[in-house]
C-alpha cells in the first residue's frame, strides 16, 4: 500500500496544511518512516505522534515539520497542539473505520505539518490541524482526487497564493480583442475599459509588436494581470527562435504565418509545445488552409481564418471550418476580419471557437459596452459562476 493525502484548512496564521503518506511497515513508506526517525535534520526533527506522553497513536505516525523550527516557542507548538491534533485525528480515523482497525499494526503514517512562524492560538492550531489531518487521511484512503476530478478542476481552480487563474483554452467560444494600434498609452487606456471575462483574450497585433517589441506583453500583464495574451508575430522564418522569444516574454500564445515554409511552421509549433504556450497558424492569404495543415507533421493548437483589413469586403472562408476540425486532435478555429456584433452568431454556427475583433472594439467610443455586446453573443457564463466553493 502506498497512499497519498493532502488537505488545507483554516486561516492564517494558524492555517493547517497537511501532506501525508500511508503505507505498509514493510513497504516504501515503512522505509521512509524508519529513515525519517533516525536521520535527523536541524529545525525539521521528526517526532512520533502521541495521544499523550507514553501513548503512541496507532497506526504509528511520524510528524515532520515543514517550516524550520527556530526556537522553543515554535517547538512547543509542534510538540503540543499540532502533535495532539495529528494523533487524535489518526485515532479517530481508526475508530470511525476510515483506517481498518485490523490493519493498525501493519501500517505507518508520515505526516508533514505546516506551522506558520506567526501562529499563536493553540486552540485554532489544534482544530485546524485535527481537521486537516483527518481529511487528508480520508482522502488518501479513498484515493481522492481521482484523475477525472483533477482533469475537471485543473482549469477551474485558482491557487490562493497565485491569486488568479492562468487561462487555458478549454471552454470555447472566446472573444479575442486584437490591438492593431501602436500608441501604448492608448492600448493601456482601452485595456482599462475592457470588462473582466473568463472568455476574453488579448492580442498584441503585429504593428504594436513591431513598434514596442515582444516585451509589450509584460506591459499588458501589468495593466491587466491574469490576461491571456496572444503575440501576433506572423512568423515567416526562424520559427523556433521567434516562438521562444514570445514564451520568454510570457505570452500565452504566438501567431505563425501559414505562408511560412512548412519546416518553419513545424519548428514553431514544436517549440510552442516545448515551452507550454499555444501555437496559432494564421491563414491570411493562404489559398488552401486545409492543404497546408495536411502537409504538416504536427498540427497547431489554433488555426486562424483571417481576412485582411484591406480585404474586408471579400467573402469569409468559414466553410472550411468543419474540414479543419476533422483533421484530428483538439484543434480550435479562430475567425478574424470583418467581425461585427450582427454576424458573430453566424461565425459560431459555422464552427468558430474564437471570434477575433479589432477596431470594432478598440476604436469604439464606448469600449466596455461594445465588448459586452460581443461577449453576450457568445452566450457563455463565467467559470463556476454559480458554484459555491469551500474546497470542492
From Swiss-Prot:
UniProt catalytic activity: 5,6,7,8-tetrahydromethanopterin + formaldehyde = 5,10-methylenetetrahydromethanopterin + H2O; D-ribulose 5-phosphate + formaldehyde = D-arabino-hex-3-ulose 6-phosphate
Pathway membership: Carbohydrate biosynthesis; D-ribose 5-phosphate biosynthesis
Protein's UniProt keywords contain Lyase: yes
Disulfide pattern: none
One annotated GO biological process: L-ascorbic acid catabolic process
CDD domains, A to Z: KGPDC_HPS (cd04726)
GO molecular function list: 3-dehydro-L-gulonate-6-phosphate decarboxylase activity; carbon-nitrogen lyase activity; hexulose-6-phosphate synthase activity; hydro-lyase activity; orotidine-5'-phosphate decarboxylase activity
A Pfam family annotated for this UniProt entry: Fae
SMART domains linked to this entry: OMPdecase
Keyword match Lyase: yes
Protein keywords: Carbohydrate metabolism, Lyase, Multifunctional enzyme
Region (3-hexulose-6-phosphate synthase): 162-392
Enzyme Commission identifier(s): 4.2.1.147, 4.1.2.43
Binding site for substrate: 19, 48, 66, 68, 83
Coiled coil regions, renumbered to chain: none
Region feature Formaldehyde-activating enzyme, mapped onto this chain: 1-161
Database matches in HAMAP family: Fae_Hps
Full protein name: Bifunctional enzyme Fae/Hps
Amino acid at each position: 500500500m502506498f497512499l497519498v493525502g493532502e488537505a488545507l484548512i483554516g486561516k492564517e496564521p494558524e492555517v493547517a496544511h497537511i501532506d501525508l503518506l500511508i503505507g505498509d511497515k514493510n513497504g516504501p513508506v515503512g522505509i521512509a518512516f524508519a529513515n525519517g526517525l533516525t536521520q535527523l535534520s536541524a529545525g525539521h526533527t521528526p517526532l512520533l505522534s502521541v495521544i499523550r506522553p507514553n501513548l503512541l497513536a496507532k497506526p504509528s505516525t511520524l510528524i515532520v515539520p515543514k517550516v524550520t523550527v527556530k526556537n522553543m516557542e515554535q517547538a512547543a507548538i509542534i510538540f503540543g497542539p499540532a502533535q495532539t491534533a495529528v494523533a487524535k485525528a489518526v485515532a479517530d480515523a481508526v475508530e470511525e473505520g476510515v483506517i481498518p482497525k485490523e490493519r493498525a499494526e501493519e501500517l505507518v503514517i508520515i505526516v508533514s505539518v505546516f506551522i506558520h512562524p506567526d501562529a499563536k492560538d493553540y486552540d485554532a492550531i489544534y482544530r485546524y490541524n485535527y481537521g486537516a489531518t483527518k481529511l487528508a487521511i480520508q482522502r488518501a484512503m479513498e484515493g481522492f482526487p481521482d484523475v477525472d476530478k483533477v482533469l475537471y478542476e485543473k482549469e477551474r481552480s485558482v491557487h490562493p497564493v497565485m491569486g488568479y487563474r492562468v487561462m487555458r483554452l478549454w471552454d470555447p467560444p472566446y472573444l479575442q480583442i486584437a490591438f492593431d494600434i501602436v500608441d501604448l498609452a492608448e492600448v493601456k487606456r482601452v485595456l482599462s475599459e475592457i470588462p473582466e471575462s473568463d472568455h476574453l483574450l488579448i492580442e498584441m497585433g503585429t504593428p504594436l509588436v513591431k513598434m514596442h517589441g515582444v516585451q509589450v506583453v509584460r506591459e499588458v500583464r501589468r495593466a491587466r494581470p491574469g490576461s491571456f495574451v496572444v503575440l501576433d508575430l506572423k512568423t515567416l522564418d526562424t520559427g523556433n527562435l521567434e516562438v521562444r522569444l514570445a514564451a520568454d516574454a510570457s505570452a500565452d500564445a504566438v501567431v505563425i504565418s501559414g505562408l511560412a515554409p512548412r519546416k518553419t511552421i513545424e519548428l514553431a509549433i514544436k517549440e510552442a509545445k516545448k515551452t507550454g504556450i499555444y501555437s496559432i497558424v494564421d491563414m491570411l492569404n493562404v489559398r488552401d488552409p486545409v492543404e497546408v495543415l495536411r502537409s504538416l507533421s504536427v498540427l497547431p493548437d489554433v488555426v486562424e481564418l483571417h481576412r485582411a483589413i484591406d480585404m474586408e469586403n471579400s467573402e469569409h472562408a468559414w466553410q472550411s471550418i468543419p474540414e479543419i476540425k476533422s483533421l484530428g486532435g483538439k484543434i480550435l478555429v479562430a475567425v478574424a476580419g470583418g467581425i461585427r456584433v450582427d454576424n458573430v452568431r453566424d461565425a459560431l454556427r459555422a464552427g468558430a471557437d474564437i471570434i477575433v475583433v479589432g477596431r470594432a472594439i478598440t476604436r469604439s467610443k464606448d469600449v466596455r459596452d461594445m465588448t459586452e455586446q460581443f461577449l453576450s453573443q457568445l452566450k457563455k457564463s463565467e467559470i463556476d459562476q454559480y458554484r459555491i466553493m469551500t474546497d470542492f
